């Protein structure tokens, strides 16, 4: 009997400790590039393009602009990548990485809320990162994300790769930025029926899908949209 009592006492001690460690694990910052917004209650989580990294083109200048101009927290995530060239086969294989992508996005939301006291989080994705982030929102309607920013949204492929399908399931405000001189514009044309007070499209004149040389225009579109929504 004494041994059984001892085991019960031990269990009562271990359960709170396990919960404590589990909570701390959830609050750990996922791999990526973070800029601290100090007392700001607003954050933007960013996801890079195919085969790139958390400090690569589009996401790197954008995260820095949001932080410097608006003072928000920014967390650019290292998303799953697949080694090899960017062939159509590789593109299709990325669907297998989406569960991992969802885990990383959720870890970012938990970190910002639990460790940084953030109350309002926007999610941004570029190219493959836009496929991943839009799919996350389509499949996690209760995530608490308050707005979505897509740059270079591509619509090829089946679910969950097709951003146009994903976007039809998203009910939060959306900023759809597309390059006017590339395939982005073709996919954006199919989304014009979604345009409303909630769904805004912004073309970047002269830009191609990599947006090189157009960082300022992309940042201006994003910061203007964020400022408008935070003023409501």
How would you describe each model-predicted region?
Residues 29-116:
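Serine-hydrolase catalytic machinery in alpha/beta-hydrolase-like enzymes
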Residues 124-133:
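Gly/Ala-rich beta-loop-alpha elbow adjacent to hydrolase catalytic centers
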Residues 142-156:
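A conserved short beta-strand
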Residues 156-157, 180-185:
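Acidic catalytic loop of the alpha/beta-hydrolase fold
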Residues 170, 176-178:
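Short beta-strand/loop motif that positions the catalytic acidic residue
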Residues 185-199:
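Conserved loop-alpha-helix segment in the C-terminal half of the alpha/beta-hydrolase fold
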Residues 195-210:
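Catalytic histidine neighborhood in serine/cysteine hydrolases
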Residues 215-232:
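Catalytic active-site module of serine/aspartate enzymes centered on a nucleophile-bearing elbow/loop
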